[in-house]
Design a protein with these regions (language model features):
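Phosphate-binding/switch loop-helix module in NTP-utilizing enzymes
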Residues: 85-146
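Glycine-rich P-loop/Walker A and Walker A-like loops and their local beta1-loop-alpha1 context
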Residues: 2-63
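Short acidic, S/G/P-rich loop/turn micro-motifs used as interaction or catalytic elements
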Residues: 27-31, 56-57, 83, 129-137, ...
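Conserved beta-strand segments of the P-loop GTPase G domain that flank and frequently precede/overlap
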Residues: 21-26, 50-52, 77-79, 96-97, ...
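Glycine-rich, charge-decorated loop segments at or immediately adjacent to ligand/cofactor-binding or catalytic sites
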Residues: 58-64, 160-174
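Substrate-engagement module of ASCE P-loop NTPases
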Residues: 135, 139-166
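Loop/turn-to-beta-strand initiation segments
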Residues: 47, 73-75, 119-122, 152-161
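Long, charge-dense
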Residues: 60, 64-103
Length: 174
């Protein structure tokens, strides 16, 4: 399935009132597909929060800027930069010290979603596989459940991105 088809399906899902989806992307094009997907959503005037567990937000911002995406209503929760020593000066990014701090992820999403101007809004996790490295499966399932319920109440569409080849049955079932 092409990323354009995936994006179209997600937009239809958002317009239909759905609140949560898991999108499984191939490892060979994962980063490129994430950028394309978020660019399409921003192009449709959705606002969003991008939670990155696999790469520093500064890299993602640079790639989105290169793709000419409008970043005026996009914010980041970065679980990587403080761990690897990346740039932590971006005003639209909240940095978390460790990917194990799942409660902080929810708190920071809540803080950032208040800044969103768009009527239709999303939160995207790049990727859930990154969280799987740091958290026990049971804890991660509970987190995904709380996240889904919290975002539904806030009317934020949640996309959990996974790397197809790295997603086991237990994570896929979460």
């Amino acid at each position: 399935m092409s990323i354009a088809t995936v994006a179209k399906s997600i937009i239809q899902s958002i317009n239909g009132g759905d609140s949560l989806t898991t999108v499984s992307l191939p490892a060979s094009s994962f980063n490129v597909d994430c950028i394309k997907l978020v660019s399409v959503l921003l192009g449709k005037k959705l606002g969003g929060v991008y939670v990155t567990t696999s790469r520093p937000s500064s890299h993602i911002i640079a790639e989105l800027e290169a793709a000419k995406a409008d970043l005026s209503d996009l914010y980041f929760v970065d679980l990587v930069s403080m761990t690897v020593g990346g740039d932590t000066n971006d005003p639209r990014t909240l940095f978390i010290e460790s990917p194990t701090m799942l409660e902080s992820v929810l708190l920071n999403i809540s803080l950032l979603e208040r800044r969103l101007k768009a009527k239709k809004r999303f939160v995207v996790f790049d990727s859930v596989n990154g969280l799987n490295i740091y958290s026990e499966p049971k804890v991660l399932k509970e987190f995904i459940n709380v996240l889904g319920n919290s975002m539904r109440i806030k009317e934020l569409y949640s996309m959990l991105l996974t790397v197809k080849e790295q997603t086991d049955d237990e994570l896929a079932a979460a």
